[in-house]
Amino acid sequence: KNDSKVLFLVFDNHDVPIGHIGLADGLITDSLVEMDNIVRGDKTAQKGLISLALYELISWVFISTSCKKVYLRVFSDNFKAISIYENLQFTHINKEPLKKNVNEGVIKYEFLESNKNADIYFCYMELARNDHFKNYENIKNFNG
């Protein structure tokens, strides 16, 4: 149990679950909220539904709270997700180096102090309230 996280299921227009999106750290701080666990589980689902759901969730966060920015972290090799986040106006802030460790088939990533032995990076991206709402027409005209 983690009281600082909330997970939402995303359904298509036929009430079929196609993925999930979440919030983290929103109960700890009112200035910055993490968009978390963004997954489109059904690869056959209509393209763009997770993007629209994420846009609406971010809108709700900004309307319902005094939060000025939302952020997320994504693996640097997840080009599809990064493209989606850029279309939602998230900007790259920094990259954190990670070392991949495999133990008995379980993969875990460890943060590194330097880039020297990094296997991959965690991209930290942010979206400001004003940038989000300026993007409304682009998102609403999106047809997947």
Label every model-predicted segment:
Residues 1-43, 129-130, 140-143:
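Acetyl-CoA-dependent GNAT
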Residues 98-144:
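C-terminal "cap" of GNAT-fold acetyltransferases
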Residues 86-96:
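Conserved acetyl-CoA-binding loop of GNAT-fold acetyltransferases
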Residues 40, 46-61, 83-87:
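Conserved acetyl-CoA-binding loop-helix of GNAT-fold acetyltransferases
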Residues 31, 68, 121:
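Residue-level signal for beta-strand positions within conserved beta-sheet cores that form or flank
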Residues 71-82, 98-103:
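Conserved beta-strand-loop-alpha-helix junction that forms the acyl-donor binding cleft
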Residues 62-73:
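Conserved GNAT acetyl-CoA-binding A-motif
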